[in-house]
Amino acid sequence: LFDDFVFNFAANRKLQMSRINFPLPVYHNDKLKKKIEKKHWRMEHFFMRQDYYTLIFDNRRQMNLVKDTTIDHVIVEKVFYRKKVVQQFLFNRINGLWMMTSINYKPMYQNMNASFLKFYGAFATDTAFQARHLHNPVKFTGPDPDDDFSTMTGDIEPETWPAFAPQLPHGMIYNIIYGQKYTESSQKIFVIRGIANGLETQLTFKRIGGKWLLMKLEM
């Protein structure tokens, strides 16, 4: 699985150096800017210095791609909000081995998730904005506080939202494209996936009448 590879790649310098196609082409807006020689490469830790990473999907079906062993092209994205730039690391499976083959920088507004990324940037950092973009009610599925082995489902009214609101990553977020073909769809599933603890939070957003709303929170 690509996930198994990328965790090792981000943690193991020797493996990383052996799995990059040096000199590594770096593109800005699809134009070749430079090539990085092996001796100038700085170890890329991706999300290993934090205990989670984030993913964006259009629908549930796309989420199954993570477990698909036949995929041979994956893009790891770093979305930088202040610079409004997306840095893409391209990986291809060559002769059975995952290799990083290029880096590409693109403006955030050119991303297939542009509308959602712009919305999420405000949703994650502005509580007043967040409150205005909640569906009434927000569907909730999460652990039952009275029973460790079962989940509870219910509705969150806007006034009780602050008690449920999860900590949302902001400033810079990750996304991994396992071959999911994004469209400017009216639904996005934003996933915060724990690296070591197996915890996962899913937020389902829908665009209704041009406005993104949080429909569902699953923890």
Locate predicted features.
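Short, well-ordered alpha-helical segments enriched in acidic and aromatic residues
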Residues: 4-5, 11, 15-40, 129-146
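Short beta-strand edge/turn micro-motifs at domain boundaries
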Residues: 81-111, 198-219
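Surface-exposed, charged secondary-structure patches
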Residues: 26, 33-83, 144, 150-199
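Surface-exposed beta-loop interaction hotspot
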Residues: 95-132, 137-152
